[in-house]
Amino acid sequence: MSLAVSTEPVRIVRHPDRVVELRLDDPGRGNALDLRTAEALRDTAREVAADPGGAVLLRAAGGSFCVGGDLRAFAGRGTGTGAYVHAVASAAHAAVQALYELPVPVVTAVRGAAAGGGVGLALVGDIVLAARSARFRLAYTAIGLTPDCGASWFLPRLVGPRRAADLILTNRVLTGDDAERWGLVSRSVEGEELDVAAHRTAAGLAAGAGAALRAAKGLLRAGTGDELGRHLAEEARLIATLADGREARDRMAAFLAARDRAKAGDSRAEADAPESVS
């Protein structure tokens, strides 16, 4: 029997096959990152790091992996927005760093939307599986912000600088199949197969030669932890600085207004509304 040992909005489930599952579990909000969720993610990631089992599975409940920052939590704070965004980013970044530095393999399962910070969080896995219908979108520049959660560090290393610039600057959307072709994810699978495939992959790793897997992962990531940490700090500084500016505040307000009109049934607003952050 699996044993749940943490609380909402992020949970830890320890499976008998030595897979430790870290589950984003706030599906009603698309697993969006506000301060409470970011701090819960940080704390659970650190708890996992203290006892990671044989492999870690990072997944999310509901129809979206993570829609990124909760713009409704950001909006209306005026010049205090930057301080709040910095707190959210710093907590989420501590989680990314803890997961990146885990000695055991990490498998990520992505379903639905992975937007904004959800992209960086997804990419922390050693092996990333995505539903074919998953949708990856950075979305930051559309609302006057810059990437966080390590997205601007992971992307050039995974897809190359040209494609990373395309994703970050134009907010291009990639499906799970696109992401596999680009090298953003390890492989894409049918949506109904994702959970089983991801757990099977993690369980296979947990049952493998533990010392060899840890050593191999150490070689793959040798010397990069400190570099990632410095980059995360700079991402947090930049996104917080921009969040205090008029451009970002106006764009976030416009984004939320478009979403509200779309929900009210305005087809024109729905066509124009971005499909990312909550």
Model-derived segments and spans:
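Conserved CoA-thioester-binding segment of acyl-CoA-metabolizing enzymes
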Residues: 1-61, 97, 278
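C-terminal alpha-helix plus adjacent terminal tail
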Residues: 1-17, 48-51, 171-176, 196, ...
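Crotonase-fold acyl-CoA enzyme core
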Residues: 9-12, 97-213, 245
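Terminal peptide-recognition signature
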Residues: 22, 26, 40-41, 58, ...
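Hydrophobic alpha-helical membrane-association signature
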Residues: 37-40, 88-91, 235
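Glycine- (often His-adjacent) and acidic-residue-rich active-site loop
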Residues: 60-95, 114, 227
